[in-house]
């Protein structure tokens, strides 16, 4: 099957699927086993892109069982961009701004717009920060760690880059107990999809060339965004992930604060075998889009052997969809 036809199949299944709390999602006891899909009749091999699209729909539903349902995006409010500061750089203009995510919730961010595009459109990038009180300042080049200034670096390379604060970091005050979200992770996904909305609204951005990049917290937030928003064609994660059994040897407490996924504790008892999704599925669900991971050999949080196992498990899916080279990792 040609890739354009495959995109139509995937889109149809994802967009017509029932909400996570209504969908009867089959149980997948082994998230590492990707070349199967399940229904009421039992387990079936994944032999075609259509088979994989069924499993992929189950992956998104499983994530929403743990994170809460992705809010309806059919009646989004205007972004209402409000610029607070403008910095005139040598090769770009940097705007400090807020935009309306939903209700009265405004997201603080930086937006880099290259100069001298001469009417041409360029790629748009969502650059997501690590766990740091600096929040968006660090990727934007306003923190002391130059090796984490990836938002600034990409802007210098000629891309339009948006660098948001994650809720409760930087200038983004947020009360997770006062919203309607089941998890902070789903709120982050929604906000980051709104960042993509903003990029796509810019005349300088080619909406078919959207990427996401992040380090640590930003690394797995880039993967979460990439699963749910198929406008994101390239996902880059640095020191950002490993499967649940390899995260501190299966000790999942670090995932359970209000900022992240509390149901991992409250519903699934901190048991990685009970959580209805894992990174094997997330990485495979990017296909046929491109995924690049930078995974260090001695990361205490995101253990590298787990990364190796995920890459090996996901590779057959990329091969099935005709894009084996779109899955890349550097150790």
Question: Which residue ranges define each predicted feature?
Answer:
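Conserved strand-to-loop "acid loop" that flanks and positions the catalytic carboxylate
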Residues: 287-304
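Mobile cap/lid helix-loop segments that gate and shape the active-site cleft of serine hydrolases
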Residues: 234-282, 303-312, 317-324
């Amino acid at each position: 099957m040609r890739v354009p036809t495959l995109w139509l199949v995937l889109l149809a299944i994802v967009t017509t699927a029932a909400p996570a709390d209504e969908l009867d999602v089959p149980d997948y006891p082994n998230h590492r086993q990707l070349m199967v899909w399940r229904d009421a009749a039992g387990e079936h091999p994944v032999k075609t892109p259509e088979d994989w699209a069924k499993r992929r729909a189950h992956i998104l539903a499983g994530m929403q069982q743990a994170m809460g349902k992705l809010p309806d995006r059919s009646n989004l409010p205007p972004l209402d961009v409000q610029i607070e500061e403008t910095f005139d750089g040598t090769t770009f203009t940097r705007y400090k701004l807020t935009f309306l995510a939903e209700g009265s919730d405004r997201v603080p961010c930086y937006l880099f717009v290259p100069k001298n595009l001469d009417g041409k459109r360029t790629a748009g990038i969502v650059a997501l920060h690590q766990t740091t009180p600096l929040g968006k300042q660090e990727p934007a080049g306003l923190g002391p760690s130059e090796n984490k200034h990836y938002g600034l670096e990409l802007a210098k390379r000629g891309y339009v880059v948006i660098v948001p604060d994650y809720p409760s970091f930087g200038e983004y005050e947020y009360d997770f107990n006062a919203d309607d979200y089941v998890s902070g992770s789903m709120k982050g996904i929604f906000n980051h999809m709104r960042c993509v909305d903003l990029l796509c609204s810019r005349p300088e951005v080619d909406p078919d060339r959207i990427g996401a990049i992040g380090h640590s917290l930003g690394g797995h937030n880039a993967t979460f965004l990439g699963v749910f928003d198929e406008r994101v064609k390239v996902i880059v994660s640095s020191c950002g992930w490993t499967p649940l059994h390899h995260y501190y040897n299966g000790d999942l407490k670090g995932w359970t604060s209000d900022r992240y996924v509390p149901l991992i504790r409250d519903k699934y008892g901190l048991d990685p075998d009970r959580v209805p999704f894992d990174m094997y599925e997330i990485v495979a669900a990017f296909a046929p889009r491109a995924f690049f991971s930078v995974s260090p050999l001695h990361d205490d949080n995101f253990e590298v052997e787990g990364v190796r196992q995920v890459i090996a498990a996901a590779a057959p899916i990329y091969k099935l969809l005709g894009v084996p080279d779109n899955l890349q990792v550097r150790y």
